[in-house]
Amino acid sequence: MSTTHNVPQGDLVLRTLAMPADTNANGDIFGGWLMSQMDIGGAILAKEIAHGRVVTVRVEGMTFLRPVAVGDVVCCYARCVQKGTTSVSINIEVWVKKVASEPIGQRYKATEALFKYVAVDPEGKPRALPVE
């Protein structure tokens, strides 16, 4: 995982709005929803690298740094940190932009984790990543 940075590391792969239906019992955005968004965003980059279907096989070091509020813009940034024969490891950071609550315009990193994806064939069996 990356060290602390003041700017997102990687490419913007997903941007969405945190909605009331995604809250936990405390009124903050549910961590599982954030993890789902990260998996979707990471899979977008992994599919581009693999030139096809991938499956998530591992999530490492999930760290929730700050809460996310309803109305916040949630941005997933992803970067490839390792390629294997069939797998790719993607570091994913979630950055939030406050647009519905104070302080308006503030940006901060809310969470980060390392996701590992494996390229698979139509039968779901691992296949080699393309050689670049």
From Swiss-Prot:
Superkingdom field: Bacteria
Pfam families tied to this protein: 4HBT
Keywords: Hydrolase
Biological process according to GO: acyl-CoA metabolic process; butyryl-CoA catabolic process to butyrate; fatty acid catabolic process
Span of the signal peptide: none
A cellular component term, taken from the record's GO annotations: cytoplasm
Enzyme Commission number, as recorded: 3.1.2.-
Single GO MF descriptor: long-chain fatty acyl-CoA hydrolase activity
InterPro entries: Cytosol_ACT, HOTDOG_ACOT, HotDog_dom_sf, Thioestr_dom
Record's keyword annotation contains Hydrolase: yes
Domain HotDog ACOT-type: 8-123
Function: Catalyzes the hydrolysis of the thioester bond in palmitoyl-CoA and malonyl-CoA.
Entry similarity comment: Belongs to the acyl coenzyme A hydrolase family.
Designated name of the protein: Acyl-CoA thioester hydrolase YciA
Gene encoding the protein: yciA
